[in-house]
Design a protein with these regions (language model features):
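Cell wall/extracellular polymer interaction/catalysis modules
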Residues: 24-189, 200-212, 217
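Active-site nucleophilic cysteine motif
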Residues: 189-195
Length: 217
């Protein structure tokens, strides 16, 4: 994957520098992303596998700057509407709100939080902070920190680097939470999108506020 990451970074640099590009056919998500200029496309290819394409909008239209990136999705595939515990990746267009990871900030335009053992993603459906990042000592947290309750401790290898997807922003209990683009461990996810860490870092350095992710079968 190192060569793919290098090519992705090179393509991003060329577009940033204003290199002329040929007009390309509009991608599948074009009518659903408003005025966004950066979109990560994820399309399922069967089971828990998908391909990711990275697009930049330029004066010549949408330009793919990273294509055919192998990705893992939920162990049970995708669904238009997901619920806690389904192990499915939500379909639709979502914001990319901020980034986090156990590693130091690799750079980029999104806010970044370096996480440790006191960082959690609250999945407790009875908690007023459901579907948000929380920082607390386990014994002092005001929500159920158990994995069986849906809460995740963020100090794990898969979250070496991650970007938060704006799924269920209304934080409706049961409608799912903790959906990220994160580093892969080589297998299906609980509903997130996972890719090679080096490639993810290249994408994170390119991302700016207003970027979107579009997910479809």
């Amino acid at each position: 994957m190192r060569r793919l990451s290098t090519l992705l970074c090179a393509a991003m640099l060329m577009l940033t520098a204003g290199t002329p590009a040929a007009h390309a056919a509009a991608p599948w998500f074009a009518s659903s992303v408003g005025a966004a200029t950066q979109v990560i496309s994820v399309v399922g290819v069967g089971g828990s596998s998908a391909k990711m394409d990275v697009y930049q909008r330029t004066g010549a239209g949408w330009q793919p700057i990273g294509a055919g990136i192998p990705a893992f999705i939920g162990a049970n595939g995708m669904a238009p509407q997901t619920h806690d515990g389904q192990m499915k990746t939500p379909m639709g267009v979502f914001t990319l709100d901020f980034a986090f990871g156990t590693e130091p900030n690799p750079g980029g335009g999104l806010p970044y939080v370096q996480v440790g053992p006191d960082h959690w993603w609250d999945g407790d459906m009875k908690s007023p902070t459901y579907n948000t990042m929380q920082v607390c000592k386990k014994e002092q947290c005001r929500f159920n920190t158990s994995l069986s309750a849906g809460t995740e401790n963020l100090d794990i290898p898969q979250y070496r680097h991650a970007v938060v997807m704006g799924v269920n922003k209304a934080r409706v209990p049961g409608n799912g939470g903790a959906f990220f683009v994160h580093s892969t461990d080589g297998g299906p996810t609980a509903g997130c999108v996972a890719i090679d860490d080096g490639t993810l870092v290249g994408i994170m350095r390119w991302l700016r506020p207003g970027a979107l992710i579009a997910i479809s079968k």
